[in-house]
């Protein structure tokens, strides 16, 4: 689990990031989870946008994704989600 200071640092880093994954009307499918998993492996910290036609609540979506992919929730702002998972082989972000 992340401490509040670690989460604050990650929020600051995510502030300038663009969302690299968009979740639309199909919702969170296995294909989307695979994309998120690959992005987390490559980048550790990612931002996801839930489109307006997505039926999931952003907080529920973040909890579901984090549970499925063993990631840490960082932040929800509107329809944007920020999640973090430390790379086991090559950690890039020092928190």
Predicted regions, residues:
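Positively charged, polar, low-complexity stretches
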Residues: 1-95
């Amino acid at each position: 689990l992340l401490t509040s200071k670690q989460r604050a640092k990650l929020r600051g880093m995510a502030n300038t990031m663009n969302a690299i994954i968009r979740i639309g009307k199909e919702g969170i499918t296995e294909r989307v989870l695979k994309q998120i998993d690959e992005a987390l492996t490559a980048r550790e910290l990612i931002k996801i946008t839930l489109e307006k036609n997505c039926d999931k609540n952003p907080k529920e979506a973040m909890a579901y994704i984090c549970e499925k992919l063993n990631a840490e929730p960082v932040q929800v702002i509107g329809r944007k989600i920020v999640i973090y998972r430390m790379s086991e082989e090559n950690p890039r972000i020092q928190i």
